[in-house]
Swiss-Prot record:
GO terms for molecular function: nucleic acid binding. This is UPF0102 protein Swoo_0351. It comes from Shewanella woodyi (strain ATCC 51908 / MS32). Belongs to the UPF0102 family. InterPro entries: Restrct_endonuc-II-like (IPR011335), tRNA_endonuc-like_dom_sf (IPR011856), UPF0102_YraN-like (IPR003509).
Amino acid sequence: MIDNKHQIPREHGQAGEKLAMNYLAERGLNFVEANVRYKFGEIDLIMKDGKEWIFIEVKYRSKAQYGGALNALSPAQIGRLRRAAEHYIQIHKIDAVCRFDLIAIDASQIHWLPNAF
């Protein structure tokens, strides 16, 4: 039996990540990696702006109900993203300025919050 219930959000998430990547690339950021997963957290996008490394969380909502994508990031999710980024920085021996951005997509609107947390 196929469980499409869990597949639909993943497809939306992947579409949102692709939109976010293109949006940021159009604004001069350089793509490094996507969907970096560790057992304790995931990084949706990693990009660079010059020498600065940017770890990006992408939130996509097809409707703006319940606060929309801008309000969809929990403190627990922020903690998991930070742990994943710290691990990525250590294993890749990155010695540079880093920041955490949020891309929130509600239907067709994209909101970019640099240094979101």
